[in-house]
């Protein structure tokens, strides 16, 4: 095998030759090919990721670990991360999605945390195509099948349809776990003289080369890539979770690492490199599922449900007994040593002898050229076509609320168990998912957001708005944000225009995080999401996590009461470009989204959190996809009561009711609280726009929409 077949570039191979002082053998070459792949090394994105603010007063563990951990109060921490499993889900939808869920759960487990909830970002192509139907059904079944069996509730997510995801659907899996602050596990604490223990499933040939496969664009014939997709077993994962947590509770493990991409090689070399130790692994000791596996296959297999433990000699017998108790394979496969050597042996022969730091962190960065797209000015030129749209808003509202990306997703959520562990306060379908932390009485609020249409028109403003829009649901619920994690889904960085979009989106995310003091504690980058030149739109996905103190109650949507006054807070000059209305009705994207307004966001945050803490409103919802009209529609449906809206139009009514962007929310306030509510929002744009009551939603200059008709449209009945 030559270096190019291993996936290495010529300058990378030259570095390897220089550092080793010799040519690598086949096993070593394969190791470098996988460990220096885009998927494992982040060589194209590392320079940009340095822009993210990573420090925060409540950050306990940040970027560089298996997941970030933030302080949840009273001696408890929340470990969380989002990660992609895009290529595998496109090739083998069920297993690709299932193992994506399993992998992110183990990342949380590796921090010493018990996984308590997951969310999933799903991006599909044309909903009417047979291909999308096959892929979406398989992916959703995979998410539900694994999460339900392993006992981790799926409490929310994001689903969006766009024809550009037809060949490259995206699955971004998020998981959050709970850990005692003094029991957080680090991947950087291994010491020489400890045993290396493999716990979990046997090792087979599934998933070999998966990391390298995820680092190139998909071919049109996906069948050939199926062997590179891993096979999951959630029942083994459940046992693995309990075994690992018991080992940690008893102080038997010093370091722990999930075996994901690149398998044993990745987990072992990363621990060695981060901890400053060497490692000798005996591949003959690895429990195998298949016969005649050669050294590099064992070293790079991505078989699921496996963890690598670093164990002090005095704790080894107890760890082996624990494996037996939980009916898991548990084997000593090596030891940690002084120095920087990473050595693989099999049958008495040394198959790899490499510097651990070179494998786990020595891949050089790539500085791709970035060019502003030549057609961007044309894309951003936009005049809203007021002709052709009636001022009657009932028809566009009924059509838009029934559109694929905005309609009810019961066909998805009914396949998920959202209540297992019985801590769910607000589950799928709401702007924010909320969990109860029984250990300290606090509530954790989680939101997931992605805005590919806005990012397509202005990636910087799109990145900024994505971050801000992920935070607003937390604030409206009453939560104070603790941190964020992101998954950066983009096409090939080798295209200068695409890399420019990637760079600008990251800058937008980073600036928003900095402006609003939201640290980035973990994340993932997924590049090369394209097939035969057909690329996905720029899709940075963000998950933000916040906390509601035990003394406060969350402010939830769907609780309108008869006689409540409806208030719109926030800017009226929102944006049609990149909106659901533009995508669904105008069938194309054009124009330039709103510029960021950091002070408006900060003012909104302060007042929204205060409104919830004072219990001034019966119901509240941030204005997200579809704008004011969709917020009114969803609140009417969820509350089972109508409203009469009175609002003057400085522009065409469509531009008022369906525009998106900016710090805006809809509040339902009982009459007794109106004076205090208006005082709380003094100095911020606020308008009373209507009154709750009746059995229809009555918009200005429009036919009343009976609630049953509105609900039927949303549910697709």
Regions found by a protein language model. Give the residues of each.
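Glycine-/charge-enriched secondary-structure boundary and capping motifs
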Residues: 1-6, 10, 16-29, 167-169, ...
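Glycine-rich phosphate/pyrophosphate-binding loop regions near the starts of catalytic domains
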Residues: 30-239, 245-248, 254, 269-273, ...
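Catalytic nucleotidyltransferase
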Residues: 233, 593-599
């Amino acid at each position: 095998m030559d270096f190019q077949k291993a996936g290495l570039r010529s300058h990378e191979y030259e570095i390897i030759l220089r550092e080793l002082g010799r040519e690598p053998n086949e096993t070593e070459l394969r190791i470098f090919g996988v460990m220096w792949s885009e998927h494992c090394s982040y060589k194209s994105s590392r320079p940009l990721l340095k822009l993210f603010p990573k420090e925060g007063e409540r950050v306990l563990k940040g970027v560089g670990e298996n997941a970030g951990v933030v302080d949840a109060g009273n001696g408890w921490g929340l470990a969380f991360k989002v990660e992609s499993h895009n290529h595998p889900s496109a090739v083998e939808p069920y297993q690709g999605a299932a193992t994506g869920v399993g992998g992110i759960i183990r990342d949380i487990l590796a921090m010493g945390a018990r996984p308590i909830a997951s969310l999933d970002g799903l991006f599909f192509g044309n909903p009417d195509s047979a291909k999308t139907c096959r892929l979406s059904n398989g992916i959703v079944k995979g998410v539900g099948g694994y999460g339900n069996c392993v006992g981790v509730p799926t409490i929310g997510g994001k689903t969006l349809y766009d024809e550009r995801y037809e060949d490259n659907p995206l699955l971004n899996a998020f998981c959050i776990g709970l850990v005692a602050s003094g029991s957080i596990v680090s991947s950087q604490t291994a010491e020489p003289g400890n045993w290396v223990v493999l716990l979990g499933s046997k090792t087979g040939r599934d998933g070999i080369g998966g990391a390298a496969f995820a680092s190139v664009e998909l071919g049109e014939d996906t069948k050939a890539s199926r062997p590179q997709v891993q096979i999951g077993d959630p029942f083994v994962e459940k046992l693995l979770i309990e075994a690992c947590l018991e080992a940690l509770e008893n102080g038997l493990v010093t370091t722990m690492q999930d075996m994901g991409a690149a398998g044993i090689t990745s987990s072992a070399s990363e621990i060695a490199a981060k901890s400053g130790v060497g490692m000798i692994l005996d591949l003959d000791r690895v429990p195998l599922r298949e016969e005649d596996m050669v050294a590099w296959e064992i070293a790079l297999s991505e078989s699921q449900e496996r963890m690598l433990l670093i164990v002090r000699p005095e704790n080894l017998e107890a760890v082996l007994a624990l494996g037996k108790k939980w009916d898991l394979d548990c084997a000593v496969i090596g030891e940690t040593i002084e120095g920087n050597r990473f050595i693989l042996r099999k049958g008495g022969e040394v198959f790899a002898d490499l510097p651990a730091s070179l494998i786990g962190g020595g891949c050089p960065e790539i500085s791709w050229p970035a060019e502003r797209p030549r057609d961007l000015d044309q894309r951003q030129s936009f005049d809203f076509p007021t002709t052709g749209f009636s001022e009657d808003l009932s028809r566009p509202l009924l059509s838009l609320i029934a559109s694929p990306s905005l309609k009810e997703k019961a066909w998805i959520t009914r396949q998920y168990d959202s209540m297992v562990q019985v801590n769910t306060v607000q589950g799928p379908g709401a702007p924010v998912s909320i969990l109860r932390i029984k250990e300290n009485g606090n509530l954790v609020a989680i939101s997931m957001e992605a805005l590919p249409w806005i990012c397509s028109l202005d990636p910087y403003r799109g990145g900024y708005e994505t971050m801000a829009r992920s935070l607003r649901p937390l604030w409206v619920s009453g939560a104070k944000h603790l941190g964020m994690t992101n998954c950066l889904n983009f096409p090939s960085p080798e295209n200068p225009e695409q890399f420019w979009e990637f760079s600008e989106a990251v800058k937008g995310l980073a600036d928003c995080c900095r402006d609003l003091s939201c640290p980035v504690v973990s994340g993932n980058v997924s590049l090369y999401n394209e097939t035969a030149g057909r690329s996905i739109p720029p899709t940075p996905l963000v998950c933000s996590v916040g906390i509601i103190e035990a003394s406060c109650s969350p402010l939830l949507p769907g609780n309108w009461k008869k006689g409540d006054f409806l208030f719109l807070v926030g800017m009226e000059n929102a944006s049609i470009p990149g909106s659901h209305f533009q995508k669904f009705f105008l069938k194309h994207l054009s124009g330039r989204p709103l510029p960021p307004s950091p002070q408006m966001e900060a003012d909104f945050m302060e007042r929204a959190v205060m409104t919830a803490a004072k219990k001034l409103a019966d119901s509240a919802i941030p204005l997200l996809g579809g704008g004011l009209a969709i917020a009114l529609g969803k609140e009417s449906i969820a509350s089972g009561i109508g409203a009469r809206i009175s609002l003057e139009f400085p522009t065409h009514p469509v531009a008022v009711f369906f525009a998106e962007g900016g710090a805006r929310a809809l509040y339902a306030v009982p009459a007794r609280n109106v004076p205090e509510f208006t005082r709380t929002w003094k100095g911020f744009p606020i308008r009373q726009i209507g009154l709750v009551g009746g059995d229809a939603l009555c918009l200005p200059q429009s036919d009343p929409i009976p609630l049953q008709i509105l609900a039927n449209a949303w549910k697709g009945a």
